[in-house]
């Protein structure tokens, strides 16, 4: 059924950030800088992995896909948010809102699956180092990434199709910076029980289960590290997992409660701040985490700068 038959609302109004008008310019500059840092930083990660043959390993294969996902993730919401900060009428068409919500959920879930695949890679590398190349072969890596994309698509498509069946009668103001699924459900004048049931069920599949897999992986990793007799071996294992653990903490720390328990009452400002954490801050920090705490990435970055300096002369 077409949106025109289901809804009398042709557009939504995004309230945006809860800031005063005189603060708009400062926050616009801040978020523009953060967005550009996200795009350029993750593009640099992808470039380094592509150019340096030493980085053609399963770990960096997953990282390159994570970098692409982070760029796409931020690009779904931040450009529209920046544009709204420069205009007085912060509207978004019904179709654009549904599309934004679809891709937001898609890349959120894809992040979760990719981070889980990286945890499995670290588990094999530390717990089964002698069989690493046999287990983490190219076919398995491609399969894990392909499944991540397919499951993410299925998840976002299920939410989107269910949402298009709802009616939006009069209220069209979204107290958010983008078209958030939970905010849209609150505006609907239809029965949203099925939507909330699917939201909770899918949330368990794409958030809780991957998180449990990560915990189990690091449980085995921790047990293996404790059996390592040398401090050098422990340091190497920790340095291998440190970057990934930081990303896991940032990602799940900011979205776990809000995504899994969407009906829990919370202030609007808190929802916006949490959303900004995982749409702006986390994608921006990921390149720094992997470049500053990873020896291979720092060496590849040094080679790139040396090559650029050589050609500049």
UniProtKB/Swiss-Prot annotation:
One of its GO terms (biological process) is signal transduction. Keywords: Cell membrane, Disulfide bond, G-protein coupled receptor, Glycoprotein, Membrane, Olfaction, Receptor, Sensory transduction, Transducer, Transmembrane, Transmembrane helix. It is found in: Cell membrane. Disulfide bonds join 97-189. Residues 1-25, 80-100, 159-196, 260-272 are extracellular. Pfam families: 7tm_4. Coiled coil: none annotated. The chain crosses the membrane at residues 26-49, 58-79, 101-120, 140-158, 197-219, 237-259, 273-292. The keyword Transferase does not apply. GO terms for molecular function: G protein-coupled receptor activity; olfactory receptor activity. Residues 50-57, 121-139, 220-236, 293-313 are cytoplasmic. One of its GO terms (cellular component) is plasma membrane. It is a multi-pass membrane protein. Belongs to the G-protein coupled receptor 1 family. Odorant receptor. This is Olfactory receptor 1J2. It comes from Homo sapiens.
């Amino acid at each position: 059924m077409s949106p025109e038959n289901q809804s009398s609302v042709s557009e939504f109004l995004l309230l945006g950030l809860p800031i005063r008008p005189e603060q708009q310019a400062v926050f616009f500059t801040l978020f523009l800088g953060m967005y550009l840092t996200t795009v350029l930083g993750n593009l640099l990660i992808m470039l380094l992995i592509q150019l340096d043959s030493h980085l053609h390993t399963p770990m960096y294969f997953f990282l390159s896909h994570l970098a692409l996902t982070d760029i796409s993730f931020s690009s779904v919401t931040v450009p529209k948010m920046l544009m709204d900060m420069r205009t007085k009428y912060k509207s978004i068409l019904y179709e654009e809102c549904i599309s934004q919500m679809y891709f937001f959920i898609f890349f959120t879930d894809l992040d979760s699956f990719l981070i889980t695949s990286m945890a499995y890679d670290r588990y094999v590398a530390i717990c089964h180092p002698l069989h690493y190349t046999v287990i983490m072969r190219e076919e398995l890596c491609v399969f894990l990434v392909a499944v991540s994309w397919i499951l993410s698509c299925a998840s976002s498509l299920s939410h989107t199709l269910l949402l298009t069946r709802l009616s939006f009668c009069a209220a069209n103001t979204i107290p958010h910076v983008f078209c958030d699924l939970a905010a849209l459900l609150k505006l609907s004048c239809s029965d949203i029980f099925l939507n909330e049931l699917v939201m909770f069920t899918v949330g368990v599949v794409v958030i809780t289960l991957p998180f449990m897999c990560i915990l189990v992986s690091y449980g085995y990793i921790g047990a293996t590290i404790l059996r390592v007799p040398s401090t050098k071996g422990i340091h190497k294992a920790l340095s291998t997992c440190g970057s990934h653990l930081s990303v896991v903490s940032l990602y799940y720390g900011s979205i776990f409660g809000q995504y899994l328990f969407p009906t829990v009452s919370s202030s609007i400002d808190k929802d916006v701040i949490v959303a900004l954490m995982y749409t702006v801050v986390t994608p921006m920090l990921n390149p720094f985490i992997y470049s500053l705490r990873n020896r291979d990435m720092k060496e590849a970055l040094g080679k790139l700068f040396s090559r650029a300096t050589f050609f500049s002369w």
